[in-house]
Amino acid sequence: MRVDLLAGTVYAPCMGSEAPKILVFDSGVGGLTVFSELAKARPDARFVYAADDAGFPYGRLTEDELVARVVAVMDRLIERHAPDLVVIACHTASTLVLPPLRQRFPIPFVGTVPAVKPAAALSRSRRIAVLATPGTVARDYTRDLVETYAAGCAVTLVGSRRLAALAEAELMGAPGSDEDVLAEIAPCFADGEGGRTDVVVLACTHYPLLLPRFERLAPWPVTWVDPAPAIARRVVQLLGAPADLRADGEDREDEALAVFTGGAGVTEPLRRALGARGLARVAIESMPLAQA
C-alpha cells in the first residue's frame, strides 16, 4: 500500500496562482518523483528541474560542504531561472540547508523531511523503519523526529549507501540486480516478539523510483510512505490551485526544462525517461563541485 500523507487536507493559498515558475532541486534524478506529483497538481506551472549531478552523491560531503554547495548552486539557478518557489526535493539537503536558503533568498522554499509522524500513526504493529541515506540517518533532526513523533514505536533507521545510485542507474538504463536491491532494503524488515515491521518511510526521494521492485522483493507486504504527494499539496497551499489551463487544452509540459550541473550521466535512456515525464528539454549548466 502507498500513502498520500495529506490526502483530504485543504489549505487556503497565500500566493497568487497564475502560471508560477517552480524550481525542483535534487542532487540527482530522485526529485523526479516529486516533480511528477507537482506537475499533476499544477499542470499550468512552468517547471525547471535541476539535478546537481556534479555534486552527487551529497553523502560524501561534510555538513559545511553540503550547505556551501547547495547555497552556491542555488545562487546561480535562481539568478538564471528566477523561480517563484523552490522545492528542495532531497532529504539529505533539506535537513541542513533550508534555514540558510530562506535567510538568503526572498522566495518560498519547500523542503523534504522524513515522514516519521504519519508512519507512526499508520503502524498497527508499532514497528516502523526509516529507509534513508547515511547522512539523513545521522542527522540530529531525524532522531528528534523519532523521539517526538514515534516514541511509542520500535524504529529501525536504515542508512543505505547504494540505493540512490541504484535508482540513478535504473533511469539511465543500467538497472542493478534484484539481489543488490534486496540487500539494501532487507534491514528494514524486523520480525520479533513484538510483531513485524508494517510501515517503511521512504526518506530519500530517489527511493520511490525503485518502489515497484521494493514491493516485489519485500519479504512481506508493508505500507510504503512516499513524501511526494504531500510536498505537492504543500506547494498548492502556497501557490493555490491553477486558475485555468490553456485555452487550447494543452498544459505547459513542453516548456519544462531539466538542468544538470555535470551531465556525465545524461544518457539516451535517461533523456527518454525525462521526456516521458514531461521534461523533453535538457540543458547542461556546468557547475563543477570545486568551483560551485
Segments (PLM) and residue ranges:
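Non-catalytic structural scaffold of enzyme domains
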Residues: L6-A292
